[in-house]
Amino acid sequence: MLAPDHARASDHAGLSRSPVDDSVADRRPILVVDDDAEILAMLRDFLESEGLVVRTAANGEEALDLLWEVEPALILLDMRMPVLDGWGFAERFRERRLRCPIVVMTAAESARRWAEEIGATAYIAKPFDVNELLQTIERHRQKDSKPN
């Protein structure tokens, strides 16, 4: 399980994981939005070790600011954050008519309901299995159809 109190993502090298599909040259980042600095660092390290480009934000406001600079392939979104929570982020995201799959990630039992409330593509419960995380990302991320 990938959890904040576990070792760094690079220490998970011995685990059997589902490979991320790199047959498509997609360099658009995965945007991870979470107020827990350890989770951000761990997810960034792990996803980068899987060949993905990652950007991080500590709250919804930072994430919205980043969206002026990058077009993510997928957003991993925590719901309970200071400054601007997941609900506020989703509302402002939609107001800007942005389109990108959003995967809610939360430890709350209400994950499914919250994902439905904000119109998220999917949800994943914390702590999550690395295989489940990679499969969710691969299943829902937008592929860049432009050649490099």
Residue ranges and their predicted role:
Residues 103-105:
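Hydrophobic/aromatic residues positioned on beta-strands within the core alpha/beta folds
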Residues 78:
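Active-site residues of response regulator receiver
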Residues 81:
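Receiver (REC) domain active-site loop signature in two-component systems and cognate sites
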Residues 58-62, 84-88:
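Acidic catalytic/metal-coordinating carboxylates
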Residues 65, 87-98:
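Short amphipathic alpha-helix used as the core "switch/output" element in two-component signaling
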